[in-house]
Amino acid sequence: MALGSNTKFYETPNHPFQGERIADEANLIGRYGLKNKEELWRAQSELRGYRREARKLLGSAGEHETESEEFLARLKRYGILNEQDQLDDVLSLDVTDVLERRLQTVVYRKGYANTPEQARQFIVHGHIVLDDARVTRPGMTVETAVESSVGFDEHSSLSDELHPERAEAQE
């Protein structure tokens, strides 16, 4: 018997066709190199969960002080919030804040790839390591503490500075 969850990790939009929403989604997919809209909807659902949790904690005022601190610490650890941000700042987050913390985006922003799509390819093909461990999930959320350890695998052909794909970026 197969094990696993039959629930989706995202929620689809309520209305199937809204031109403005579709244009916004296409823009985000292109900017962050996402494979399909499901990845975008998953990030939106993750953000929706953060905001729901923040509203719950704000509504209960001082009752759940430790939960509030743990929640804020988690978001700060992932780099979604800055160190000085408070609980009500979670409500003003945007989906781009979540998408910026994906491994694919971090690899692209650090200059290891020329495009977000190329960053995705490098990750999926096993050329990228995180804390000396090969990671093949482009949608993985990168913590700020390990962000500096992102790099090419030493056994990868891309670790050579003169590799054609890396030489393109230097020109």
From Swiss-Prot:
Gene3D superfamilies: RNA-binding S4 domain. Residues 152-171 have a biased composition (Basic and acidic residues). GO terms for biological process: ribosomal small subunit biogenesis; translation. Keywords: Ribonucleoprotein, Ribosomal protein, RNA-binding, rRNA-binding. InterPro entries: Ribosomal_uS4, Ribosomal_uS4_arc, Ribosomal_uS4_CS, Ribosomal_uS4_euk/arc, Ribosomal_uS4_N, S4_RNA-bd, S4_RNA-bd_sf. SUPFAM superfamilies: Alpha-L RNA-binding motif. One of its GO terms (molecular function) is rRNA binding. Residues 148-171 are annotated as: Disordered. SMART domains: Ribosomal_S4 (SM01390), S4 (SM00363). One of its GO terms (cellular component) is small ribosomal subunit. Residues 101-165 form the S4 RNA-binding domain. It comes from the Archaea. Part of the 30S ribosomal subunit. Contacts protein S5. The interaction surface between S4 and S5 is involved in control of translational fidelity. Belongs to the universal ribosomal protein uS4 family. One of the primary rRNA binding proteins, it binds directly to 16S rRNA where it nucleates assembly of the body of the 30S subunit. With S5 and S12 plays an important role in translational accuracy. This is Small ribosomal subunit protein uS4. The gene is rps4.
